[in-house]
Amino acid sequence: MSTIVFGSFTCHLDAAIHQDNADRLAKAWTRPENRQVSNVHLLCRRAAKSLINTYESATASAWKGLEEKLQPMFAKREFSKTVTKRKGLRCFKESSEKFIEKKLKKQYKEERERFQFLNGPDAIVNQISVDKCEASVWVPFPHIIEKPSFTTPSMKKKVVFTKVRMSEASLQLFMRRVAANAKANGQKVEIIGRKRVVGHYTTKSRLTYFRTHVRHLDGSKPRYDLVLDEATKKILQLFANTSGFHHVHKKGEITPGMSGFVVNPMNLSDPMHVYDTDLFIVRGKHNSILVDSRCKVSKEQSNEIVHYSDPGKQFWDGFTNSFMQCKLRETDHQCTSDLDVKECGYVAALVCQAIIPCGKITCLQCAQKYSYMSQQEIRDRFSTVIEQHEKTVMDNYPQFSHVLAFLKRYRELMRVENQNYEAFKDITHMIGERKEAPFSHLNKINELIIKGGMMSAQDYIEASDHLRELARYQKNRTENIRSGSIKAFRNKISSKAHVNMQLMCDNQLDTNGNFVWGQREYHAKRFFRNYFDVIDVSEGYRRHIVRENPRGIRKLAIGNLVMSTNLAALRKQLLGEECIHFEVSKECTSKRGENFVYQCCCVTHEDGTPLESEIISPTKNHLVVGNSGDSKYVDLPTAKGGAMFIAKAGYCYINIFLAMLININEDEAKSFTKTVRDTIVPKLGTWPSMMDLATACHFLAVLYPETRNAELPRILVDHEAKIFHVVDSFGSLSTGMHVLKANTINQLISFASDTLDSSMKTYLVGGLEVDKCDEFKNVKLLIRSIYKPQIMEQVLKEEPYLLLMSVLSPGVLMALFNSGSLEKATQYWIARSHSLAAITAMLSALAAKVSLASTLNAQMSVIDEHAAVLCDSVFVGTKPYASYMMAVKTLERMKARTESDHTLNDLGFSVLRQATPHLVEKKLSPGVGAGLERIKLVGKVLCNLGIAAVAKTYTKTFHPERRSRFRRQVRHLRSVITWQPIQTPERRSSAEKRRRCLLHTPVDGKAILQSYRNFHKFSSKHSEDV
C-alpha cells in the first residue's frame, strides 16, 4: 500500500504503483530544478494521471472477459423483476420466453413510432388525415422462431355451467334444507365467503348446537380466532338456528369443550366480551369473562385466555404419539385398515376398563385406589366385570378375535385360585408334622400349591425341585423309637423367655420403648369392629366377670381393676377362685407314634405334678403375649381413645390373630386382616376346635411366613369342661387350670396334624354364645307398639335400639314420627343417655326428610344415604340391649349395600333393587294402616258414647219440652264431630209408615254454634253427673 499527498490531503494508492515508479518519482523530487512548487505540482498531476490510467486499463482488462461471459445473463436480467423472499432476501426472478417476446415487440413498436415521428416532414396540421405515402423507412421486426411443442394436446373440453339464479325465499328454503340434512346425517357445512367457514352440528346436554371450526383448535393462539364477513354471518346465523341457540344458559353452563359453539349472546348469564348482539362464538374465558372468537385480542391476552377446546384432543394426541412409537416395526405383512375405527374405539374402551377399571381415566383417586388393592381384591371385584366385557365383545364385535382371546386369557389368569381348602387341610392332618423325606417335600408342595395364582416363578422352580426329590425317595420309611409312659412324663417350663425380635427392634419402638403399630393399627380395626365389644365403664365391670361357655364358666379378674387403698382388702384380690384339681393324665399329653410332642402338652413341675395357673392380674388396653415364659405387654392399637375392648361372643381366639398381626409387615396388614375376616373366621365360627384353629394358623403361616415366630397369648386348659381359654388383658380370677406349653404359632400348628394322638386337639376355643334375633318379628313388634302406649313405653325403656328397625320401611318410620313416639323417646333419654337421645333426634330428622319425597324409591334413597351416618353414630362399643347388635347389623348391611350400589352405578351397571322396596312396604304397611283404622274406630265409639251419656243426663235433668230441641242440637253436633250425615225419619203415608229413609240434612252454622254454646253451658253445670 502506497500514499500520495495532495497539499494537505493524503491519498492511499493500491499496490498497482510499482516500486520502480516510486524510486523514479523520488529521484525527480530530489532534483534542484524540480523543487519549485509549480513544477512539483505539475509533476504530481502527471504521475497520478499515468498511474490512474494504468490502474483503469488493468481493471478493464481483468473484467472484460467476465463481462463477455455474463452478457447473456445481463440480457435476461433486463427483463427480470426483483422479488422479496420469506426472510427479506431480494433477488431477480427470470421471466419466461413468451414474456420476453412480448416485451421486445412492445419496445419495437414504441421505437418505430418514435422513429417515424422524428423523421417525418414538418407540417402545419390543419386537419387530421392519414397520409398513405411513407416518408421514412423502418426495418421490420425480426421473426422469432418458436420451438416446436412435442406434448400431446389436451382432450379436455371446457365445461361452462349455467348460473343458478334463485329468489330470496328460494335461497332461504334451500339453506334450511341443507341445514336439516347436515343435522340429520352429521355432515360438515362449509360457507364460502371471503374466508372459508367450516362447521357441523353437535349435541351437548340434550341440546343441538352449530359448532364452527376455530383456529385455536389447531393448536395456535391467534389474535383473531375467526373472521366473518356480513354475508357469511347471515348464512351462519341461519344454520345456527338450533335448540342450543335459543336455550337460556345459566351461569357456568358454558364449559370447556364448547369452543366454536354458536350461541345467542342475549341468552347468556356469564359476563362476556360481545362482538355483536346477533351471534356469540365461544372461544374461552379471560379473567372469568367469556371471549368471542371474533374479538381481536393482544398477544398477551391470547396466551392468558383459557381456551374451551375439546379435552379429548389432548388424549388422542398423546395416544397417537405413543402408539406410533410403540407399534411393531417388523411385521410379515403390509398393515391395512380393515376394522371400523369407531368399533375400535368401543373395543379399546372395553379393554381399558377390563385392565384398569376406573370412573375417569384422569381421576387420581381411582388410580391410587387400584394401586392399593391386593391381588385377592382385584380378583374378587373385577373377574365378573371382565367376563361381562368378554361377552360384549363376543356378541357385538366378533371380528375382534384377538381382543376376545386376550380377555379370555386375562380372566383365566385372574381366576387362578386354589380354593380346595379341604384337601390342604387333609394333607396337613396326615403328614403335616413329618419332617423327613419324602414327607417334607410333600408338605412343601402342598404349601406352594395352596397359593394358587400368587405363586411366583421361583415358587414353580422350587415345586419342581421337590417333585424331583419325591421321585428319588421311597414313601415307606419308618423309625423305631422307644416309647415312654405317663409316670415318667416331665414337661418343665423353659427357664428362658422367648425372644421376640419384633418387640426388640428399635425401628418399631417409640421413645418410651412401646411397640408402634403403624399402618397395622388402622387395619386392626377390622378385628375390633367385628369381634370385640367396648366396655362401658359407667355400667361397671361386674357384668363382664363371668364368662360363660357351652360346658361351664370362667371368671375374669376385670373386677380387680377397681382397687382399694386398704392393704388387707388389696391382698384379698390376690386370691382367686380355685377350680377342680385335675392330675396329669393321658388328656394332658400329645403323642406322635411313641414320642411325646411336648409343645402340645401341659406344663408340669420337676416332680411330674401339673403346673396350675394362679390368679392373673388384669390390665387396661393391653395385649398380653408370652404363654409359658414371662409375659410381654403391648399397647392395643385402638387404645388411644381410652376405650376398653373385650372379645365378643365365641371369639376369644381372635386374640391369637391379633398377636400374629405384630409380626406382619405393615404393607401386608390389610391383606392379612381381610383374609382372617373373610376366609378364616367364617370357617371357624364360634367355639372352634383346637385342630381347626391350628389348621387356620397353618394356612396363614403359609401365606405370611413371618407369623410362625409370633408369640401366643397365655392359653389355659380346663380338662373338666374340655375348653381352651385364651387369656386376654383382663386376666383370670379362676385358678387351678393347666397351662399349655405352646409358645409360638409354629408350635401351635402341631395340633393340626391328623397323626397327632391327643385328645386336646378336639377341645373348644372361644368365648360367649350369641343369641339370634329375628328382624321381621322385631319390626312387627315395633309396628304393634306404635298405637299401643303401654308396649311403646316398655320398648323405649328396655329396648330403645329397636326404634332403628324403622329404617327398613318409610311407612313405619313416618308412622313412628307422626305418633309422637320419637319425640317421647328423645324426652325420655335426654337426661339418661345422650347417645340414645341423639339417635332418636336423627331418626326424627330422617323422617322429616323422608316425608318430602314423593315416591317410594325416593324415600328409600333418602334412608340409604343416611344409613352410613346412623351406623357410625350407633356402633360405639357394646350396649346391654338385645336389639343393639341387630340394629348394628341392619345398618351395616344397608351401608354396604349402598356403597356397592354406588360402585355399580359409577361403573355403568343398573341396580335391580328399585323393583323390590314396594314388596317390603306392601308386607309391612298393612300393619300400620290397620292400627290407624282401629284408633279411628275407637275414637268414634268413645265420641258417640260421650255424646249419648250427655244427652241421657240432659233429658233426665231438664224439662221434657226441651228434650226434643236438645236432641236436635246434639244430633247436629254429632254430625259435625263424626263427619256423618244426619239421619231423620219422616212420616209418610200409611203405606210408607213402616219404612224409614235416611236423608242428608244441610248443616246450619248458626244452629251448630248455638248448640255448642248450650252444650258447653250444660257440661259446665253438670260435669259431675256426666
From Swiss-Prot:
Task: Name the lineage.
Answer: Viruses, Riboviria, Orthornavirae, Pisuviricota, Stelpaviricetes
Q: Name one Pfam family in it.
A: Peptidase_C6
The name of this protein is P3N-PIPO polyprotein
Keyword Hydrolase in annotation: yes
Active-site positions, per UniProt? 216 (for p1 proteinase activity), 225 (for p1 proteinase activity), 259 (for p1 proteinase activity), 652 (for helper component proteinase activity), 725 (for helper component proteinase activity)
Domain Peptidase C6, residue spans: 644-766
A Gene Ontology biological process term: viral translational frameshifting
The yes or no answer to whether the keyword Lyase is present is: no
UniProt motif (Involved in virions binding and aphid transmission) ranges: 618-620
**Source organism:** Plum pox potyvirus (strain SK 68) (PPV)
